[in-house]
Amino acid sequence: MPRSLKKGPFVDDHLLKKVDVQNEKNTKQVIKTWSRRSTIIPDFIGHTFAVHDGRKHVPVFVTEAMVGHKLGEFAPTRTFKGHIKDDRKSKRR
């Protein structure tokens, strides 16, 4: 069930303050955050966020197409290394 429209998108306050400060100063520094749950709003366009994936911070550059999505969607938490090839010939010997 999606969030109610009357509530508006959720954005952590500390994250919004950091973006507002950078917009006032016209700077584009990387903003380190653990807030994967924050919704991307139009104020975030053009900023780079370092989103934590559980072990490191993944850089995410925000574009117009990302508005409305969550920051965590662009920082995958699981690394798939692939399945090991099943070598049937060596098992027979």
From Swiss-Prot:
Pfam families: Ribosomal_S19. One of its GO terms (cellular component) is cytoplasm. Keywords: Ribonucleoprotein, Ribosomal protein, RNA-binding, rRNA-binding. One of its GO terms (molecular function) is structural constituent of ribosome. Coiled coil: none annotated. GO terms for biological process: ribosomal small subunit assembly; translation. PANTHER family: RIBOSOMAL PROTEIN S19P FAMILY MEMBER, SMALL RIBOSOMAL SUBUNIT PROTEIN US19M. NCBIfam families: rpsS_bact. Belongs to the universal ribosomal protein uS19 family. HAMAP family: Ribosomal_uS19 (MF_00531). Protein S19 forms a complex with S13 that binds strongly to the 16S ribosomal RNA. This is Small ribosomal subunit protein uS19.
